[in-house]
Amino acid sequence: MVSKMDIRSLQYFNQVAESGNITRAAKQLHVSQPALSRQIQEMEKELGVQLLVRGHHRIQLTQAGQYLYNRGNEIISLMNHTIQNVSEKDEINGVLEIGAGESIALLPVMTVINQIIDQYPETSVNIVSGDEQLIKQKLDNGALDFGIIMGNDNLIDYQSLTIPDDNIWGVLVTKDDPLAKLRVITIKDLINRKILISDQAYHQDKLRQWAGNDLNKLTFSGRFNLINNAKLLVETGNCVALTYKGLVESSKTVFRPLSPILKDHNYLIWNNNHQLSNVGKLFVEKLKNQFQTNITRKF
């Protein structure tokens, strides 16, 4: 079945979802409450699913409604972004949509973003945190202009820039943990410990290359997407976390690097098949200059 649902219908539905109340959403949309209710009912009839559970004071999204809300946001954002890119001439304006993993090596990227939004008041930035899989998915469907990923050298489907500084792998432990007394952590030190690791790293070969056959002796007790949440579990003293240097600060924990040293590169990537906006082109140009300046200063 091909739906006749349009962008306005998605905008109306998403406003209802965010407001949690049809009457409130109607006021914000400047339409009547009965008209908005009919719009939602027509969407449900057309799609053949229930989107909302209507309570006395607040509506709740069904599973189908939550899916439509999430994808609707992406579609609306992509539409606005497309209109902006098509209508611009030589002006530098609009939103830079950037997806990024966690790394302190991103400081030069943030410096360039700050320069652009400071120099061009009509620009802004939307930074989405996520792992490589999410970032590539959003790049491919046009929801992001750029992605910043770590540790993956297979970039054949994307344009890319290598960000100069690397990420240093190590272990986050509590200050009273025996491992905190060590200067570096070897694979032998991690045997018989409960280890937390990022979901992305768990599915890559980098750690296996470092640990060799001893990787099978390690106990991975949990996975995470954001280290700040995993840090709370580390602070209980029951687990340690494999992570990058410098991502978390805590009065209860310390970071110890792995030995032999293990590093990941950082890459800025963008889609081969999508034309960049003016602000996107400026972003790449400024980054190239910034990276070249940093490299020159190191010699």
Regions found by a protein language model. Give the residues of each.
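Short beta-strand-centered segments that line the small-molecule binding cleft or hinge
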Residues: 2-4, 70, 111-115, 132-169, ...
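Short helix-boundary/capping micro-motifs
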Residues: 14-32
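A short LG(V/I)-centered, amphipathic sequence patch enriched
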Residues: 44-61
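Central regulatory/effector-binding core of bacterial HTH transcription factors
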Residues: 93-155, 215, 223-226
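A late-sequence structural motif
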Residues: 108, 257-299
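Hydrophobic hinge/microswitch elements
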Residues: 131-144, 149-150, 201-254
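Beta-alpha-beta core module
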Residues: 156-162, 166-168, 225-275
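Secondary-structure junction motif
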Residues: 193-215, 276-284, 294, 298-299
